[in-house]
Amino acid sequence: RTVCPNNEIITDNAGKPSVMVYTPKFTMKEMIAGGSDRVHPAFVVNGVERDGFYISKYQNTEIDGRGYSLPAEIPRNCVGFDLSRSKCTAKGRGWHLTTIQEWGAIALWCKKNGHLPYGNNDYGKDKRENMYRAIRVSNVETGKGRVLTGTGPLSWSHDHTVAGIW
């Protein structure tokens, strides 16, 4: 909890934690000038309007065949859709892959609030920020620039704070 004081720690059916960021419900007009009073589709699940949703703070790492959102871990990569989905649903009720609607809501929020998150696009750093680097997974991975989850600068977070989505 010390590393992520403004986030939620949610456990799965195996009792293992994931760090999650809560996104409260908003309407289209709150994000887009001239938008409608409709609630953004990310907040409507099976026809039921929700107050918000949780999204993984970090790219997931794999523990015991399941995905977990944890800081300073090696992110799982090269996983196909079906395997990714099974790793999420194995965690129990309510766990799912992030939907296109949820990513859309996050993108609209970022645009509205003037935040364009940076990220690892140059072997552990962002090409736009030469001074900042994340912690590389391994310096011996020739040609690979993967970094430990959440170790980049604040500009890599969706809201540019420690509480954001990395």
Feature-to-residue mapping (PLM):
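Short aromatic-cysteine micro-motif
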Residues: 38-166
